[in-house]
Structures are given as C-alpha cells and as structure tokens.
Regions:
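Core catalytic lobe of class I
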Residues: 1-143
Length: 143
C-alpha cells in the first residue's frame, strides 16, 4: 500500500486505524484528529502546544543588535486569558492521555513562558513528570 507522508484530515473520516496513521503526519485540527484515533494507541507522544507568549502589541527592540523581535503573532498562539490557555492545555492533555498506552511516555515542548503552567496541569491530571530536558538555544527570541 502506497501512502503519502501527509494525511489531510477530513470531516468525512470518522476513525483512523493504526495502519492509516503509522509513519505519517496527520494534517488537521488536533482536537478533531485526536478524537478519531483508537484509545491506547501510542507508546510515545510528542506535543508542541502554543506557547501563549503574550508579547506586547508594540515592537520589542533589541538594542544591542539594532533590530526588532520577530515573534509569533498568529491566532493559534492567542488566548484571552491564562484561564483560557489553561483550559486549552487541559483539554489537549486529556485527549492525548486517552491515546497513550499505560506505560507510554510524553514529551512536551514549551518555553519558560508556559512550561510551568503546563507542568502543573500535567500533575493535576495525574501525569508523572520524570525529568526536565532543557535545550539551550543560542539565539532565543527575544534576546
């Protein structure tokens, strides 16, 4: 069977079996796609949720290098409040948890703006945090 690497979600699809999604990227709204996958499917889950950077509406200048911060300014990273963001993360983590096998591992990518909120929510939902992995980025935004 010849599958393309990318599988675009469709409202006409009600269910994805493991053979449908194995070694593929599912392109679509995460909340919709996650609901279509059988429970306890994955041994490992990797999520990179919105960071909710809350950058000001004005330009942020980097005085030492004489330029401005080019930040995420897309709708998918905007939330009306911390409560809205927390509700989004809670919903996402519940949906993901349903798909994880009992001994599965989850990796969550975040920034210092959001990782502690996400970690608290994970603990409140019963996730056990084994470790923190810190990637040192030499050109972070804003710097």
């Amino acid at each position: 069977m010849n599958h393309s690497l990318i599988l675009k979600d469709s409202p006409n699809i009600d269910f994805y079996g493991l053979s449908d999604i194995s070694n593929r990227v599912l392109w679509g709204d995460a909340f919709s796609v996650l609901d279509k996958i059988e429970p306890e499917t994955f041994d490992m889950v990797f999520i990179d949720p919105p960071y909710f950077l809350q950058l000001p509406k004005r330009k942020l200048y980097r005085w030492k290098v004489k330029n401005t911060v080019e930040a995420v300014n897309d709708d998918w990273d905007k939330f009306a409040s911390f409560a809205d963001y927390d509700n989004f993360i809670t919903s996402l983590l519940r949906k993901v948890h349903r798909l994880m096998k009992p001994q599965a591992t989850i990796w969550v990518i975040a920034t210092y703006h959001s990782i502690f909120r996400i970690g608290k929510i994970m603990q409140d939902l019963g996730y056990w945090i084994l470790n923190d992995v810190v990637w040192v980025k030499t050109n972070p935004m804003p710097n």
